[in-house]
Amino acid sequence: GVDSTDIIVGQPSYFEKFASIYNDTDLDTWKNYLKFHFVNNYARLLNKDLVNLNFDFYSTTLRGVKEQAPLWKKTVDASNSVLGEILGKVYVKENFPPEAKARMEELVDNVILGYGVAIENLEWMSPETKLAAKEKLDKFTPKIGYPDKWKDYSKLEIKSDDLVGNYIRFSEWSYADMTAKLGQPVDRSEWHMTPQTVNAYYNPVNNEIVFPAAILQPPFF
């Protein structure tokens, strides 16, 4: 009664070892293990004692951080981690208008054209390799500023008086969002970085480069 699905397992030996540990470990030990990790995962959000213990070990002992971030910074980071694209819509509305995106897209298009000319003029590259390089360049996807399609958070319930519950519901929503993609075509319009992130990345698997709006603002650009 279980449907079989082919998946890619990057490290099969992990599951072989895990199966052995799973079978050899008694149920009470697994229960205690899961209880600990559940509390540990949310310790930074619970009472003051647990917040301090969590910080003392993970931040001070392991990373040498001496002081906790102020409450406002924790609040912003928490909201950003859960509702990143909602905040991103606000950010680009105030800081990155459509004309700024169009200007950057034109700049990147010109860079891609330049790459095409450079490939054609490479003396050491064979005609076959040039053809393959041009085909890859033709399929290259630049993503500028912000997504053309924003994430839909309408099924995620957020309560102002339930911080831990918000995180749990976000985990459930995120899991449902991921599993809904199984067996579906890859959504190449999806972003894996928010517009307000000061960073950029190249994804070789998808042959795409991503420049969030924040990295295209002074003093970075």
Regions found by a protein language model. Give the residues of each.
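Short amphipathic alpha-helical coiled-coil/interface segments
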Residues: 104-119, 133-144
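Noncatalytic, helix-rich "gating/capping" subdomain that lines the substrate-entry/channel surface
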Residues: 1-106, 110
